[in-house]
């Protein structure tokens, strides 16, 4: 069939640290609301990291029965909830669809550390015979896609991408390709994560990847000269991607069009991005080429923007390498300045952000940004902007050198 089918966004759902729906999340973004606060899941007395961006007031009973909830860890519950919102938002009636042409591409970077910690404690205290039979199906990361498919009767291609912090973006990109090539008419796609646990916080702290600031206003500050690590977040964002003619036939509302997907690998280091930014630059240019858009046509980038020292420096170099002098004309922001780093869900949350920005003609500010160092001399959006957003490019860069970019455009016939 070839790569000639247009793909549009027709539904969205979100469970985030600043709101448990797309509407709540987006209102929070426009208000500059941050989701950072003391970790409540466990006692952090012995931990250097005290803050996280936790989801608040999440009730799985709103989205599933008690039996289903007991058979899912929180990362799966988040995904099923966000997927339900997205499917409802899209007005997708599975009784009217060929279920084998509706697929699922929902990734998690880690899966359930909670299940692993809980059952490891049981192993050490009571022996191997007392480890729960549900450990594996509760823990493994592909169960997000599995549970979403089970919950909503999705019998088409089912994918679980695991590329660390690029997971959500790759998941949406692979769903896009699936529709382009005719293997599905509709894909439920995105990412989910719930890793604010003792071992999760301890492990990322040992990497010196997390911010140790105890001031919520100065913890996640992408591109700021005082940035010192990311704040771990949690949640899920899921979108409904649909082949254009299929969407039009059923009278679906169309939020935006997904027109480009680019990837690369740094092949450089297990945690650090390539210092010259060449890998991320290639992913961005590949997405633009895929979408038939010249670099100088782009006006806005939703950056990976984690608030680590390396990311701020190396992603800036990547943007300059990809766009040359035009880099200075771009508006660049980081959604992580408000919700922290949702790891495998980050790219999906930022994709939803870009869709809303295109829809409303609004570019949010990078909250907490005060002053940058000399090499970080681009426009990182200290202020928000009300303006037409014809295209939005969103970047995700994962441990292991995984780079992915998606290009969205304002939908026109």
Model segments located where?
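ACP-dependent fatty acid/polyketide chain-elongation machinery
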Residues: 1-68, 245-257, 352-366, 409-413
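Condensing-enzyme catalytic core mediating Claisen C-C bond formation in acyl metabolism
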Residues: 6-10, 37, 215-291, 300, ...
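Conserved beta-ketoacyl condensing-enzyme motif
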Residues: 9, 25, 30-163, 192-201, ...
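A glycine- and small-aliphatic-rich helix-loop capping segment at beta-alpha/alpha-beta transitions
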Residues: 23-28, 114-128, 178-181, 201-214, ...
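Active-site-adjacent elements of ketosynthase-type condensing enzymes
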Residues: 45-54, 111-115, 194-220, 262-282, ...
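Active-site-proximal alpha-helical scaffold in enzymes
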Residues: 79-92, 141-145, 149-193, 231-252, ...
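Phosphate/pyrophosphate-binding loops at sites that engage ATP/ADP/AMP, CoA/4′-phosphopantetheine
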Residues: 86-98, 151, 247-251, 284-300, ...
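Glycine-/small-residue-rich "gating" segment that lines the acyl/pantetheine channel
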Residues: 125-132, 170-173, 177, 193-249, ...
């Amino acid at each position: 069939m070839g790569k000639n089918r247009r793909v549009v966004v027709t539904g969205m759902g979100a469970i985030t640290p600043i709101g448990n729906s797309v509407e709540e999340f987006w209102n929070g973004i426009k208000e500059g609301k941050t989701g950072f606060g003391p970790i409540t899941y466990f006692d952090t007395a012995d931990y250097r990291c005290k803050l996280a961006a936790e989801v608040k007031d999440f009730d799985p009973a709103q989205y599933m029965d008690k039996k289903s909830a007991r058979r899912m860890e929180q990362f799966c519950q988040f995904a099923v909830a966000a997927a339900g919102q997205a499917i409802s938002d899209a007005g997708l009636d599975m009784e009217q669809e060929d279920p084998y042409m509706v697929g699922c591409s929902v990734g998690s970077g880690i899966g359930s550390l909670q299940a692993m910690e809980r059952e490891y404690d049981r192993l050490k205290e009571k022996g191997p015979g007392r480890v729960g039979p549900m450990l594996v199906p509760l823990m493994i990361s592909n169960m997000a896609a599995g549970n979403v498919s089970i919950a909503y009767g999705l019998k088409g291609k089912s994918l679980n991408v695991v590329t660390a912090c690029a997971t959500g973006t790759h998941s949406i990109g692979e769903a896009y390709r699936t529709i382009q090539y005719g293997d599905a008419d509709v894909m439920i796609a995105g990412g989910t994560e719930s890793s604010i646990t003792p071992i999760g916080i301890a492990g990322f702290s040992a990497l010196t990847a997390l911010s140790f600031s105890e001031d919520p206003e100065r913890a996640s500050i992408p591109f700021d000269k005082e940035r010192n690590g990311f704040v771990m977040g949690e949640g899920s964002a899921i979108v409904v991607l649909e082949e254009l003619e299929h969407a039009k036939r059923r009278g679906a509302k169309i939020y935006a069009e997904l027109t480009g997907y680019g990837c690369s690998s740094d092949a450089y280091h297990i945690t650090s991005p390539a210092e010259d930014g060449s890998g991320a630059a290639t992913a961005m240019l590949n997405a633009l080429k895929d979408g038939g858009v010249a670099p100088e046509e782009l006006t806005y980038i939703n950056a990976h923007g984690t608030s680590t020292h390396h990311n701020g420096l190396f992603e800036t170099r990547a943007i300059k390498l990809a766009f040359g002098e035009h880099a200075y004309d771009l508006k660049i922001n980081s959604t992580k300045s408000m919700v922290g780093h949702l790891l495998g869900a980050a790219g999906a949350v930022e994709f939803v952000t870009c869709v809303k920005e295109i829809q409303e003609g609004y570019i949010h500010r990078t909250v907490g940004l005060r002053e940058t160092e000399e090499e970080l001399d681009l426009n990182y959006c200290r202020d928000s902007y009300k303006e037409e957003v014809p295209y939005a490019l969103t970047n995700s860069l994962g441990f292991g050198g995984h780079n992915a970019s998606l290009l969205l455009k304002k939908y026109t016939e």
